[in-house]
């Protein structure tokens, strides 16, 4: 009986000592730990969401529709709003095609205020013919929705699919060129 009790006490003692060894010592007031003071904690980036949402890291994206309208007016550039859903296969395909096309990326970087939205906006001008995705709407610096710049579908005027990148680029160029002739 005494041997069993001694064994239990020994196991508990070893367990307590093991925990004490593995614990980090507490800092005393007035002392500094040079390692933790100099090295910031690592930043976890896995799963981090950015404003580009995969549409182009080198493009400057605005966060909200209101911010986009203000910047369009302030910078005298058209606002291009991409409405999409992250789990929609058509949105994913358009995103991949848009990212892969150098001209689309260049125009977006240099000539547009860019916004991509995964939720509807209160402005009904953003959905004149429905709330489908993906759809791309152009707004000029006078804050007018460009209803003349649309995709090739009659029933979903602002829809584009992955094969429509040339049409989208044409509309981007038109949106940009109208600035020179209209304003």
Curated annotation (Swiss-Prot):
InterPro entries: AGR/TXD (IPR051099), Thioredoxin-like_sf (IPR036249). One of its GO terms (molecular function) is dystroglycan binding. This is Anterior gradient protein 1. CDD domains: AGR. One of its GO terms (cellular component) is endoplasmic reticulum. From stage 18 (neurula) onward, expressed in the cement gland until it degenerates. More weakly expressed in the adjacent hatching gland. Belongs to the AGR family. Keywords: Secreted, Signal. Residues 1-18 form the signal peptide. It holds the Pfam family Thioredoxin_7. Does not appear to be required for cement gland formation. PANTHER family: ANTERIOR GRADIENT PROTEIN 1, ANTERIOR GRADIENT PROTEIN-RELATED. It comes from Xenopus laevis (African clawed frog). It is found in: Secreted.
């Amino acid at each position: 009986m005494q041997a069993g009790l001694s064994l239990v006490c020994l196991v508990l003692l070893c367990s307590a000592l093991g925990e004490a060894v593995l614990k980090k010592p507490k800092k005393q007031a007035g002392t500094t730990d040079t390692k933790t003071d100099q090295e910031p904690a690592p930043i976890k980036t896995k799963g981090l969401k950015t404003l580009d949402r995969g549409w182009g890291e080198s493009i400057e994206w605005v966060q909200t529709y209101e911010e986009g309208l203000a910047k369009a007016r302030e910078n005298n550039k058209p606002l291009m709003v991409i409405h999409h859903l992250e789990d929609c296969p058509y949105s994913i395909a358009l995103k991949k095609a848009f990212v892969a096309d150098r001209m689309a990326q260049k125009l977006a970087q240099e000539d547009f205020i860019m916004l991509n939205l995964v939720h509807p906006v209160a402005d009904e001008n953003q959905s004149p013919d429905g709330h489908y995705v993906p759809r791309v709407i152009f707004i000029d610096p006078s804050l007018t929705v460009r209803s003349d710049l649309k995709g090739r579908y009659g029933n979903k005027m602002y829809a584009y699919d992955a094969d429509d990148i040339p049409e989208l680029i044409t509309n981007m160029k038109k949106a940009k060129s109208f600035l020179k002739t209209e304003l």
